[in-house]
């Protein structure tokens, strides 16, 4: 790193009162710093440039406009949280976040879930709703790429998330850059879509925000990535979130979850609901066969999804009871949101493949309870 870059880092440290500035090891897998601190990066990713993002998202690119909204990466800063038990000996997941306001630190009540799922948090500062969308997207991409070179990260567990306007940014990255955010995304009280959607009464519509990405990327987003949509009963974006979730379902996205928090408005969800989203993202999945868009909206999703996920999970653990318990928790997420067909699919798989475990017995009882729903 050059002296000039180091000077910039020191300046950031002075400005970030109360936070610890530290460089993680340059090589992937380094132990790095733990706890909460601020980082800067000097190596900009090719995918974060204005031209690359505009091309990937199907947006026009005006040279004079690009110059106005572009950024110099060493001048930017990122808030990082690394769980205390990270040693660099095993791979962690990476949760790349985008806020609607200038700060990038994680809410304190989310840290337990981040620790539990062995995730590292990174979020750009000064990337709120008052900034153009392309640099916001670029900074999130730069965070994802640079953190993977500094920490031991599982590339299949790189997730993107955000709240409100940050959720909209995350939702575009989760689909448009599924080759980077291979684990998928968690879109909280805000999301965008690649197609215009009309409300059920036909009186309103929500315009398309971006274009479908290249076929290989789009297939990965539909078949391999997971996508969580979280809204609240009183969230102003609830209707749009519901429409877009149904659009994902229509287009055969195989691993999707809709969470609607009772009584919640346009605000951060509490720790319990944040944990529900992370739990779904972190459940292992297997690659399914190619999907095609139907001519009419299907009444149910494909029955192979839960079976594939369960099969993959079973290969990752030796304790059958533990695996069955994890799958039962996932089924409960569907039940909590009245997604009975998806829940039934997963419960049946548990009963058939984990006979003799407490979770199988509980799954059988639950199937009786939801019969006919």
Features from the language model and the residues they span:
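Short amphipathic alpha-helix adjacent to the substrate-entry channel of hydrolases
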Residues: 105-123
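Short solvent-exposed coil/turn linkers within tandem alpha-helical repeat scaffolds
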Residues: 251, 264, 351-364
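A domain-start/cap signature at the N-terminus of enzymes
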Residues: 23-92, 246, 256, 290-297, ...
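Alpha-helical segment of the N-proximal tetratricopeptide repeat
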Residues: 322-349, 353
């Amino acid at each position: 790193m050059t002296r000039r870059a180091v000077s910039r880092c020191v300046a950031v440290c002075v400005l970030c009162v109360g936070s610890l500035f530290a460089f993680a090891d340059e090589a992937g897998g380094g132990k790095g710093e733990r706890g909460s601190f601020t980082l800067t990066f000097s190596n900009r990713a090719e995918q974060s440039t204005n031209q690359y993002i505009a091309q990937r998202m199907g947006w026009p690119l005006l040279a004079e406009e690009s110059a106005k909204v572009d950024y110099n990466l060493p001048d930017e800063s990122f808030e990082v949280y690394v769980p205390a038990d990270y040693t660099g000996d095993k791979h962690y997941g990476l949760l790349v976040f985008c806020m609607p306001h200038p700060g990038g630190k994680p809410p304190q009540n989310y840290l337990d879930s981040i620790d539990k799922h062995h995730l590292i948090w990174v979020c750009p500062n000064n990337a709120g709703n008052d900034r153009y969308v392309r640099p916001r997207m670029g900074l999130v991409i730069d965070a994802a790429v640079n953190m993977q070179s500094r920490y031991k990260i599982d590339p299949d567990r790189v997730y993107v998330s955000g709240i409100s306007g940050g959720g909209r940014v995350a939702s575009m990255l989760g689909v448009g850059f599924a080759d980077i955010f291979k684990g998928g995304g968690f879109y909280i009280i805000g999301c965008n879509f690649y197609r215009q959607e009309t409300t059920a009464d036909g009186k309103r519509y929500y315009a398309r925000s971006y274009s479908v990405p290249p076929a290989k990327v789009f297939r990965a987003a539909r078949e391999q990535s997971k996508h969580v949509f979280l809204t609240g009963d009183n969230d102003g974006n609830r209707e749009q979130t519901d429409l877009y979730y149904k659009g994902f379902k229509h287009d055969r996205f195989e691993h999707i979850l809709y969470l609607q928090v009772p009584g919640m408005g346009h605000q951060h969800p509490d720790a319990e609901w944040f944990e529900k989203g992370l739990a779904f993202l972190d459940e292992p999945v297997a690659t399914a066969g190619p999907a095609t868009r139907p001519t009419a909206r299907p009444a149910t999703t494909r029955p192979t999804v839960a079976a594939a996920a369960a099969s993959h999970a079973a290969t990752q653990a030796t304790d059958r009871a533990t695996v069955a318990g994890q799958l039962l928790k996932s089924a409960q997420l569907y039940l909590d949101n009245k997604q009975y067909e998806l829940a039934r699919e997963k419960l049946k798989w548990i009963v058939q493949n984990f006979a003799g475990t407490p979770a199988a017995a509980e799954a059988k009882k639950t199937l009786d309870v939801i019969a006919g729903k």
